[in-house]
Amino acid sequence: STLVDNLEKAFIDDNTVCFLQEPVEIWNNIKDKDGKNMIEKYYSNQEKYAFSFQMMAYISRLSILRKAVKENPNSVIITERCVHTDRNVFAQMLYDDGKIMETDYQIYLRWFDEFIEDVPIYAFIYLQTKPEVSFQRVQKRNREGEVIPIEYLDRCNKYHDMWLSENIPD
């Protein structure tokens, strides 16, 4: 993201701050026999691939975060997207929409809860962006297989707002 890139440039000489981009490369490398990656599969059929995509997103994000914590024990770690966003925005939204089934959602929550203690989160930086702006950015970056309707981005925005408004102290 632009924000993470700019922060990384600002802290380039500070080895106490570590930056982690979204692990899209990992997602692109998981392919079926026809060469379609997980991002393509997810956006072409969310009902079928919502659970597997969310598990993969969480596992890959958690994996790079745990590695960063281990390799940089006294550093501030800034991630492009928080693992809590996986649970409280994307997985929750897909579950509410009936795209992740009840039993799969329970499995997801168990997996999430089992490992989340390994990576304590002390603060969130939330850059609120209008869905229309996000839509333009998605089109501009033109990532392979990423066809995201503006309605999906609007719902993501609403779920971010709901989750964060519940977690902001009065």
Where are the regions that the model predicts?
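Anionic group-transfer/hydrolysis microenvironments
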Residues: 23-24, 82-83, 130
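A glycine- and Lys/Arg-enriched "phosphate-lid" helix/loop adjacent to the NTP-binding pocket
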Residues: 87-159
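A generic structural motif
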Residues: 13-17, 74-76, 119
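A basic- and aromatic-enriched beta-loop-alpha substructure that forms the phosphate/nucleotide-
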Residues: 53-101, 125
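A generic secondary-structure signal
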Residues: 10, 111-115, 162-166
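Conserved substrate/cofactor phosphate-moiety recognition/catalytic segment
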Residues: 9-55, 60, 89
